Amino acid sequence: MIKQEFLKKMQEKKYFQDHRKVLIAVSGGLDSMTLLQLLIVSQKELAIELAIAHVNHKQRPESDQEEKALVKIAEQLGVKIFTSSFSGNFSENAARQFRYDFFGKVMQEGHYTALVTAHHADDQAETVFMRLLRGARLRHLSGMKAVQPFACGELIRPLLTFHKSDFPDIQHFEDSSNFQNDYLRNRIRNLYLPDLEKENPQFKDSLRYLGKEIEDWQTALSHLTRDLDIENVQVFHQQIPQVQRFLLQNYLENFSGLNLSKQQFEEVLNILQTKANYQHTLKKDYELVKDYQRFEIRKISRKPDLKMDSILLEFENLIEFGYYRFSFGIPLSGENIQKIFVSRETSLTLRFRKEGDSILLNGHHKKLRRLFIDKKVSFEERNSSVVVEQNHQILAILNIAISDLSKALKSDIMSTVLYIQKIDG
């Protein structure tokens, strides 16, 4: 009965429509052996080529024999099998990471576009309950997705609507560690959920429905806000606080290596809601950069700090510095050439800003820090602004301001022009 229902579900959902080479994760337990059997008998209708991937965790004496048996089964079925053995200090997380790294490698090397796992409805209920116990955010209580991106293709979980009780008792290997309550998932499966089902026999289904409802809520809100430019500060501020929170959570999903604690999330949200111009270092080599118009989270650059450098430019010479081409007294050809009046009698110093810098504007010296604030110059522009200096006095801050000193040189007989052209950085 399950075979017909499975095939019907796969054809309705079209999980395999875009896949021809499919890799099945097989542990040897009832769940994965059932999945293997279902895909074998549905192979022709689904138009897929199958292969098996198996990881021997080396934690039980019988695991080597089980691996050999799976290799034999694969040969009998005429299906390729890829195996690997775990080594190192064992933990649930380490083993999981090893498995999926191995699966991804096999997919890439064998050109498989789908990895299929045997997670079922009971696993889904356990996952939702476990995340609830650990205090996960609401969006993460949606449980496992039936299809999601993975490695060079997709990870497909076709059994999420089937219960373990639906599976026939076919040949499989029983993992004795599943009955040991050393791990949280085993305690949930063997102790917590059975007790709660005494109060509500439909408790597992209730957990699954909760997960599905949360997933639908997440999908609906994402759809309604899909056209918002979240990195636009004005757009972000126009939203009510609850929508701001949702948008930021959605935005953070783009950074797989960045897992903020609840406290860190609140700090970032507060910065976006209140700070005007700000840079905030986050964990995992990420930083938040915000100016008056936009914000972004990005990887911290490990390039050499160009701000420690300065360079001398002599008359009738050309040089490149800070993603610009500078020509002292020799005209440049091209579009968008900037011009600054300078003296031809002494060399120019090109550098980045320093603490305490000031520039003469309208007869008064003004600190660069205050100038940047008044002009609402973004943090990025502040750090990349090139200072043009002559005789230890600032003539210009590129793209920001030109000093009275440079303007006065326009009518000086000993003046010339510094030509500036942007180059690709």
Swiss-Prot record:
Its cellular-component GO annotations read: cytoplasm
- Domain of life of the source: Bacteria
Q: Which principal EC class is assigned to this enzyme?
A: ligase
Spell out the SUPFAM superfamilies in the cross-references. Adenine nucleotide alpha hydrolases-like, PheT/TilS domain
**Principal cellular location given in the protein's record:** cytoplasm
What does the record list as GO biological process? tRNA modification
Which keywords does the record carry? ATP-binding, Cytoplasm, Ligase, Nucleotide-binding, tRNA processing
Q: What is its EC number?
A: 6.3.4.19
Q: Give the CDD domains listed for this entry.
A: TilS_N
One molecular function GO term is: tRNA(Ile)-lysidine synthase activity
Residue positions binding ATP: 27-32
NCBIfam families listed in its UniProt record: lysidine_TilS_C, lysidine_TilS_N
| Function summary | Ligates lysine onto the cytidine present at position 34 of the AUA codon-specific tRNA(Ile) that contains the anticodon CAU, in an ATP-dependent manner. Cytidine is converted to lysidine, thus changing the amino acid specificity of the tRNA from methionine to isoleucine.
Query: What is stated as this protein's family in its record?
Result: Belongs to the tRNA(Ile)-lysidine synthase family.
Against PANTHER family, the record matches this protein to:
TRNA(ILE)-LYSIDINE SYNTHASE-RELATED (PTHR43033:SF1)
The protein's name: tRNA(Ile)-lysidine synthase
Organism annotation: Streptococcus sanguinis (strain SK36)
**Phylogenetic lineage:** Bacteria, Bacillati, Bacillota, Bacilli, Lactobacillales
Q: Which gene encodes it?
A: tilS
